[in-house]
Amino acid sequence: MELMVKGADALTVSETTFGREFNEALVHQVVVAFAAGARQGTRAQKTRSEVSGGGAKPWRQKGTGRARAGTIRSPIWRTGGVTFAAKSQDHSQKVNKKMYRGAMKSILSELVRQERLIVVDNFSVEAPKTKELVAKLKELELTDALIVTSEVDENLFLAARNLYKVDARDVAGIDPVSLIAFDKVVMTAEAVKQVEEMLA
């Protein structure tokens, strides 16, 4: 199949990468796993065995008229431990390479179908100026876009950093979440070739 390239000849690409059927279940599973892997999972509360104090019995067992108590660390007490204390845990989920590649191909194919993937011959800015990038995006009639280049372009990265709905990445930096997070995805022809090789 062929992809239209702005300002250049059409680019021949693989049908399996850019023309496959959308697998919603697979994409959902991979995106959820990706989001789960981004969780820190560092929360920690103290159980009754971890709270400080509570060595001595607060008052004697009988004769005070108060309810019996053996420790000030009891979860019933204001300064006691937490009954079912939340502990740090690993939320990451396993995603096989085949599944990951399948989800990426599915997303790219859907972007092509919905005409949300824009392929350009070249995309760069002369200086790390946001104004320059805004002008370039205006030419393409874009306000919400992910820009993917074949290699890290520092000027482009710095220019995009201050824009709310614009991000610039190289091919190695894209993932399922970033591809679906933006309204449009702008890729250079060289980046398209690299993506195809990466997912082959």
Curated annotation (Swiss-Prot):
Record region (Disordered): 42-65
Record GO terms (molecular function): rRNA binding; structural constituent of ribosome
InterPro entries, per the entry: Ribosomal_uL4, Ribosomal_uL4-like, Ribosomal_uL4_dom_sf
GO cellular component term, pick one: ribosome
Key words of the record: Ribonucleoprotein, Ribosomal protein, RNA-binding, rRNA-binding
Pfam family, one: Ribosomal_L4
Ribonucleoprotein as UniProt keyword: yes
Gene Ontology process terms (BP): translation
Keyword Ribonucleoprotein: yes
Function summary: One of the primary rRNA binding proteins, this protein initially binds near the 5'-end of the 23S rRNA. It is important during the early stages of 50S assembly. It makes multiple contacts with different domains of the 23S rRNA in the assembled 50S subunit and ribosome.
Subunit structure: Part of the 50S ribosomal subunit.
Family assignment from sequence similarity: Belongs to the universal ribosomal protein uL4 family.
Protein name: Large ribosomal subunit protein uL4
Gene that produces this protein: rplD
